[in-house]
Amino acid sequence: MDEPAYRRVVVKLSGEYLAGSQPFGIDQPTVDRIAGDLASARALGTEIAVVVGGGNIFRGVEVSSRGVSRPTGDTMGMLATVMNCLALEAALERRGQSARALSAFVMPEVCELFTRNAAHKYLSEGRIVLLGGGTGNPYFTTDTTAVLRAAEIGAQAVLKATNVDGVYSSDPKKDPSATRFERLSHSQALEGGYKVMDATAFALARETSLPIIVFSIAEPGSIGAILKGTGRGTIVAS
């Protein structure tokens, strides 16, 4: 078997994707399919941590205009990410893939607190580590969390799973003439204003020289394909 392209990665999943075709909530068949993809990718030999959003359950930004303060709303959203991590952890364990959820918040009855040492330990043991609670601070997205955690644990890349197969010059769903980039620098991604990740995430990735691979999660097996170097996507790297 060929060596995977990366020894350790952070996979960033959107919470909305876990809802499947539903407007909100957790769609179990979708969670099970993603768990299968993650387990298959782990079998290639790459150590995998996962940061998942919480938008399928709660979005703090949306309630800030309805009387809930932004910090409170963001905290509620970060707690939603822990729920998604627990759902993925259970789905992975059912498949026989050992997993461990870690949270940025202290909640010992629910899951262990994130520390770099704990993440290193579980990753080296072959577990898939699920990172919930965002950064633990309001105003930071889970995209930024993914880059931050990747830098902290020494990951070699962030795999940003989306519903399109890379970064395009414009929205390919609205503009049939949109072209896909094979490669961009972090600075080009920032200056171009591409909406695939927020500016803070791109800036932190640039500062830490961390590659981001943007790809579509819709195709089963796409995570493994990226790790093997055969997947379709856009590499954002300096």
From Swiss-Prot:
Activity control mechanisms: Inhibited by UTP.
Cell membrane in keyword set: no
Single GO BP term: 'de novo' CTP biosynthetic process
GO molecular function: ATP binding; UMP kinase activity
Coiled coil: none
Pathway named in the protein's UniProt entry: Pyrimidine metabolism; CTP biosynthesis via de novo pathway; UDP from UMP (UMPK route): step 1/1
EC number: 2.7.4.22
NCBIfam families cross-referenced by the UniProt entry: pyrH_bact
Complexes and interactors: Homohexamer.
Described purpose of this protein according to its UniProt entry: Catalyzes the reversible phosphorylation of UMP to UDP.
Protein name: Uridylate kinase
Organism for this UniProt entry: Nitrobacter hamburgensis (strain DSM 10229 / NCIMB 13809 / X14)
